[in-house]
Amino acid sequence: MVALLLAGGVAKASALELSMWVMPVTTNAAHDIPALIAPWVAAHPGLTVRVTVLDWESGWNKITAAAASRRGPDLLELGSTWMPAIAAMGGLEPLSAAQLAEVDNGAPYYPQLWKTTQVFGRPGVYGVPWYADVRAAFYRTDVFRQAGVDPARAFADWQSFRDALRRINGITVGGKRVAALAYAGKNDWNVVHNLAPWIWNAGGDVLTADARHSALDTPQALRAIDFYSQLAVEGLVPSNALEKDSDILEGAWVGGDYGVIFSGPWLMRRILEAPAGSVVREHFDVAPYPAGPHGHATFFGGSNLAIFKGSRHKAEAWDLVKYLGGKAPQVRLSLLSSMMPARVDAANDPAWTSRHPVFAKLTAIAADGRAYPPIPAWGPLETVYTKHLGQLAELTAGIGDKYSEPAMRAMVHDTVTEANKVLEEAE
């Protein structure tokens, strides 16, 4: 945890200090976030801002403790799936009608992201979207070219995607054998995010329409889970990949070990920081999720900014939240972090889209972005989903019982049973 004080004009003992908690959205957030808000601070003499950088591993506990005690920052960043829980705890200040009017009632932001500033089935908006995580297929253009695979066809639908993986699997490029696809297995934080788009594109969902029950056992969801699992059963995802987490696999993809990986815009930072002339840096592109029977939606998440309920400086905190929710600061943050802006106009700004062709493609893919229902119980629900669905990796890798559709269905049944208990207890 790192804290840094930023002062506007000449600091005085009587200066009003705002406390701001953020996550490490850039590689040096302790420097970059104060630099991002420096113009706002300069325009507000007598105000100082203390920026504290939390980490994703311990941030949840610190934020929930603050919400429970009403002792915390004036404003803070919240992951989009965290926000409903903290709002439901009474930890966030809802935006007033006047404040909502100042941000045009959310019109500048992607609708799916604006939805995450609310609590499902309840009135009230608790913040503004700050930056976005949109998922896409990152693939090696040199691998596809050597295998004679047309990327446009490869990502057209599920069958063509599987056919393309079969053709690139095991191909040798530049003296290195390349596995077709990387996705993480047991206990990885991306388990649900990786699987959800396949479920949506099959016509299924992670929850029922009223968000009161799990929907993983519908025929559509089961079809998607089976297709996704069969990629590993067939060997298109190496069994050792299923034992690794997303961070390790992303590094291995950048190192040239895999042909395809589904990831988010942060991977661009890793690619662009690779040594000049590296294989992947010179030979990669992105594509949307292969279309299923019901489209090619992708996971859409990110982070929001909110005012802490216990703040004694809510007006000043809102002014800073509103500033950071503006177009220019969001474009600037995207250039610092490689995360996509949460505003539609910022995500289409040439400063972002022309930085690299992939950024423009991510903006286009975001048009099909889809967020989870903003329920307070998402945290414990995701833990259940991650635990059970992560165990599919053991089945597909042949550890213990071998994969079969009945075994998969039994595992999903257990998942749904436990998930429904979590949802029932949360009501």
Regions from the PLM with identified roles:
Residues 118-130, 135, 159-214, 258:
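Extracytoplasmic/periplasmic solute-binding protein
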Residues 109-110, 114, 281-288, 335-387, ...:
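Long, aromatic- and glycine/proline-rich binding clefts that accommodate carbohydrate-like moieties
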Residues 35-112, 146-148, 153-156, 251-252, ...:
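Extracytoplasmic "Venus flytrap"/periplasmic binding protein-like
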Residues 38, 42, 123, 147, ...:
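Extracytoplasmic/periplasmic substrate-recognition and gating elements
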Residues 145, 151, 367-427:
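Conserved C-terminal helix/tail region of periplasmic/extracytoplasmic solute-binding proteins
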Residues 162-167, 210-242, 285, 289:
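Glycine-centered hinge/linker elements that transmit conformational signals in sensory
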Residues 96-111, 154, 172-173, 179-186, ...:
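Short, solvent-exposed loop/beta-turn-alpha elements that line the ligand-binding surface or hinge
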Residues 80-136, 191, 281-290, 351-355, ...:
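Hinge/lid segment of periplasmic solute-binding proteins
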